[in-house]
């Protein structure tokens, strides 16, 4: 049980951090009470990650105080923070996938019997934690067999096993179904009842209003305000985050779909369960949305078109010409581009610079007759990506991993535009990106549509699909349940179609 003598479990006051040429944090405050869920919000690049890295000792703060349970602390590592009672459940989960569930929970502090690990005690202790958190996972199975949501539950159980007083959750629902989100909220409420303070980082407003008690907002590395959520509305939070009233969530649509450029006929993937008998058309200058519940195989469509998933039947015609697209290289040559869902694992090379990340899909274009790379053309194309995509970065040499999520996504879109595609496919293009950056991505997509690109967007966010698409194809259990005109449809009609083949 958490010591109740302190008004705040964690107090970070006046925290500042400067990098060469950039003031990342300027006197930022974060105060977390026991028995509460505290939202930490701000646009990508507002300083949330830097603040938490200062807490966990990954960065050394330049000034400011951190008080935990009434004591001044300066953690030197996340391990020290965890052992002291401050835990973080990351957006990117850190687990040893070839080890068992219970191994992952007790790694580095196994219970022993004499000289040997006491596996029975480890199993019993894991079961006890799972019972308390209502988690139904076999402690002996390998982590590699778990779903993303189960891995997330495992991270929370690990924090619980350390008797964490403060648990920080970074975009915890980004890959969860509605049912799994509800289970997560139940667990958060249990942590709250125990006296924990939960710091909840999310861009999903409905979650913030559903689960949080207080909110701290950062903007451009500065603390804007800390308030109880009661009495606040979405517009007020957005205006505090972006420093201005965001009158529109979506730009004005001015693209005009023209002639049909892509025809997909009876497309079926080889390895089932997957897509079956998918047919649709895409026009030049059209934005086609793909909706569906989790597990409806939306991603399989673009993967099959792009050649990374094998097909057993069907035809793909671009300007009336049959496209085989046996692999991604052939698809790129044929004028297709795919921005994948998992930006961090399959999109960016986080330890490499913006130049590499901008040019990697188009390397052959930079080869001179002597087989060397043309430095001049590489520099000019990287600059084109930065300028045309409006990427905020200190230089070409900046590691892409240090950019905000919105800027990373802009680089990836720019990378694919350098291949001069006719068909641009985007899978969850604004996942984990803040409100202001989303608007910029929408502007880019609409500008591309006005240049007669054919665009396919997969999204789990219904307002996004209704806000920027021309038509929406609804997937249900691997099949096309119907295509609707965006202006004439409703959320209810889309949800009805999404459950047609369940």
Swiss-Prot record:
State its Enzyme Commission number(s).
7.5.2.11
Quote the record's binding site residues for ATP: 42-49
The UniProt entry, under SMART domains, shows: AAA
List where in the cell it is found.
Cell inner membrane
List the catalytic activities from the record: D-galactose(out) + ATP + H2O = D-galactose(in) + ADP + phosphate + H(+); methyl beta-D-galactoside(out) + ATP + H2O = methyl beta-D-galactoside(in) + ADP + phosphate + H(+)
What SUPFAM superfamilies does the record tag this protein with? P-loop containing nucleoside triphosphate hydrolases
Q: Which family does it belong to?
A: Belongs to the ABC transporter superfamily. Galactose/methyl galactoside importer (TC 3.A.1.2.3) family.
Q: What is this protein called?
A: Galactose/methyl galactoside import ATP-binding protein MglA
- Gene name of the record: mglA
């Amino acid at each position: 049980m958490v010591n109740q003598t302190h008004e705040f479990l964690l107090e970070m006051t006046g925290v500042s951090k400067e990098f060469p040429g950039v003031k990342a944090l300027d006197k930022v405050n974060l105060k977390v009470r026991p028995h509460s869920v505290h939202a930490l919000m701000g646009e990508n690049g507002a300083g949330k990650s830097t603040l938490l890295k200062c807490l966990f000792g990954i960065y050394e703060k330049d000034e400011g105080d951190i008080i935990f349970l009434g004591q001044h602390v300066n953690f030197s590592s996340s391990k020290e923070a965890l052992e002291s009672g401050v835990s973080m459940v990351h957006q990117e989960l850190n687990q040893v996938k070839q080890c068992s569930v219970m191994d992952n929970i007790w790694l580095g502090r196994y219970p022993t019997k004499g000289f040997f690990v006491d596996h029975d005690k480890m199993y019993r202790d894991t079961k006890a934690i799972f019972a308390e958190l209502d988690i139904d996972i076999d402690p002996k199975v390998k982590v590699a067999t778990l779903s993303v949501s189960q891995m997330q539950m495992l991270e929370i159980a690990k924090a619980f096993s350390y008797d964490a007083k403060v648990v920080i959750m970074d975009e915890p629902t980004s890959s969860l179904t509605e049912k799994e989100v509800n289970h997560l909220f139940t667990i958060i409420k249990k942590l709250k009842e125990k006296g924990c303070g939960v710091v909840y980082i999310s861009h999903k407003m409905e979650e913030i209003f559903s689960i949080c008690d207080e909110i701290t907002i950062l903007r451009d590395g500065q603390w804007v305000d800390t308030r109880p959520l009661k009495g606040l509305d979405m517009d007020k939070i957005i205006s505090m985050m972006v420093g201005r009233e965001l009158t529109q969530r979506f730009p004005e649509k001015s693209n005009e779909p023209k002639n049909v450029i892509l025809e997909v006929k009876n497309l079926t993937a080889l390895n089932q369960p997957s897509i079956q008998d998918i047919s649709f058309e895409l026009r030049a200058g059209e934005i086609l949305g793909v909706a569906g519940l989790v597990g409806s195989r939306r991603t399989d469509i673009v993967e099959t078109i792009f050649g990374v998933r094998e097909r057993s039947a069907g035809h793909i015609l671009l300007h009336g010409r049959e496209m085989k697209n046996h692999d991604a290289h052939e698809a790129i040559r044929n004028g297709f581009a795919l921005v994948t869902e998992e930006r961090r694992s399959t999109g960016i090379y986080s330890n490499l610079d913006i130049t590499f990340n901008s040019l990697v899909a188009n390397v052959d274009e930079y080869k001179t007759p002597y087989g060397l790379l043309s430095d001049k053309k590489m520099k000019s194309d990287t600059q084109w990506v930065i300028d045309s995509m409006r990427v905020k970065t200190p230089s070409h040499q900046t590691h892409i991993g240090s950019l905000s999520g919105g800027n990373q996504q802009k680089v990836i879109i720019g990378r694919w535009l350098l291949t001069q595609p006719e068909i641009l496919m985007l899978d969850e293009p604004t996942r984990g990106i803040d409100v202001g950056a989303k608007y910029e991505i929408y502007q880019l997509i609409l500008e591309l549509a006005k240049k007669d690109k054919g665009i396919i967007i997969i999204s789990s966010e219904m307002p996004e699909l209704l806000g920027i698409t021309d038509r929406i194809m609804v997937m249900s259990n691997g099949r096309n349940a119907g295509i609707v005109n965006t202006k004439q449809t409703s959320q209810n009609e889309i949800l009805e179609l999404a459950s047609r083949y369940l």
